């Protein structure tokens, strides 16, 4: 609440696209060609640590699956090589994204959101979208598969920030401020539920509503609609038999350990076997065809088994540092009247925070099973590329903030 009121106070004074003469002058001078060593070291090292740990653990958790599958050609390095390739593509895309100023990202935001919606429509077309395990979430692009919902998380963070800046005078109005954005999110949610991808819908809703809240939307309106959203999500769960089964399996996984509670029970076994320092890297038993999706949704359970409580605590600490730096960076950008930049940074922080919290909660048995990967770490090309793009934008915000501080002080 204090965060929101603070940012609302800043937003009430000036808008991003207006700016000051000083910020415009500095903007003309800013080129990402030098001073890169000034970038936030905590942001860089926490993100690098998560990406590297993820690469190692994806390999460790996927060896048995790769060796036992004809799809992979029985090659033990299959998922490692693909994950490394996705990382290389993501880093390359991130380097390109870093070259764009935040003013350019603001101009692109509505178009990126529109492209994301179009991709979500295309993936639902029979014969176009690829179906895996009953979910039609992927667009086949030759040897690769694109998952539009992963890119949409980034696009929503950008669009929500741009929308908030443009609609700043109307943020206190339900009809003019909140309703148009809510309609867009409901459209996205309708398309995501058609795949179905309930988890992505939850994360995207959290990003959009969180950015609106930090941007100064009427608190009473926000509280009322947050309650409506929670009730709506509960109804969606209750009206869907397979989602309802997940709730029952979550409440007592051991009652049906070979059915509804299978994934959760084996995740808990992995956590129990790991104890304080784990059974050793590569020595997991649960990844040997006991724990489904060991290299994606349940990667943290394998980390817990092989590296123990110490490994899990390290991962949590790295995420906490990264998310904290994103939120602090957003606040600093707002203080310098870079409101779009600040909201984007905080939106990315919310995205990584909400998704990692849900994934960790599922792995630890604190939340019902949900098809969400661990950001920056789990196997998945679209997710890794989207995460790298988000990190590049965070670094761009950080770089521009540092340049503005230096320019204003000159």
Curated annotation (Swiss-Prot):
Keyword DNA-binding in annotation: no
The transmembrane residues are 39-59, 78-98, 108-128, 177-197, 198-218, 221-241, 303-323, 342-362, 374-394
Q: What is its EC number?
A: 2.4.99.28
Q: Where is this chain primarily localised? A: membrane
**Which key words are in the record?**
Cell cycle, Cell division, Cell inner membrane, Cell membrane, Cell shape, Cell wall biogenesis/degradation, Glycosyltransferase, Membrane, Peptidoglycan synthesis, Transferase, Transmembrane, Transmembrane helix
Q: How does it sit in the membrane?
A: Multi-pass membrane protein
Look up keyword Transmembrane helix and say if it applies: yes
Q: Which GO terms describe its biological process?
A: cell wall organization; FtsZ-dependent cytokinesis; peptidoglycan biosynthetic process; regulation of cell shape
List the GO cellular component terms. cell division site; plasma membrane
Query: Pathway, according to UniProt?
Result: Cell wall biogenesis; peptidoglycan biosynthesis
What is a GO molecular function of this protein? peptidoglycan glycosyltransferase activity
Instruction: Kindly list the places in or outside the cell where this protein is found, as annotated in its UniProt entry.
Output: Cell inner membrane
- Domain of life, source organism: Bacteria
Per its record, the protein catalyses: [GlcNAc-(1->4)-Mur2Ac(oyl-L-Ala-gamma-D-Glu-L-Lys-D-Ala-D-Ala)](n)-di-trans,octa-cis-undecaprenyl diphosphate + beta-D-GlcNAc-(1->4)-Mur2Ac(oyl-L-Ala-gamma-D-Glu-L-Lys-D-Ala-D-Ala)-di-trans,octa-cis-undecaprenyl diphosphate = [GlcNAc-(1->4)-Mur2Ac(oyl-L-Ala-gamma-D-Glu-L-Lys-D-Ala-D-Ala)](n+1)-di-trans,octa-cis-undecaprenyl diphosphate + di-trans,octa-cis-undecaprenyl diphosphate + H(+)
> What is known about what this protein does?
Peptidoglycan polymerase that is essential for cell division.
**Family classification:** Belongs to the SEDS family. FtsW subfamily.
Recorded protein name is Probable peptidoglycan glycosyltransferase FtsW
Q: Which organism is it from?
A: Aromatoleum aromaticum (strain DSM 19018 / LMG 30748 / EbN1)
Origin organism lineage: Bacteria, Pseudomonadati, Pseudomonadota, Betaproteobacteria, Rhodocyclales
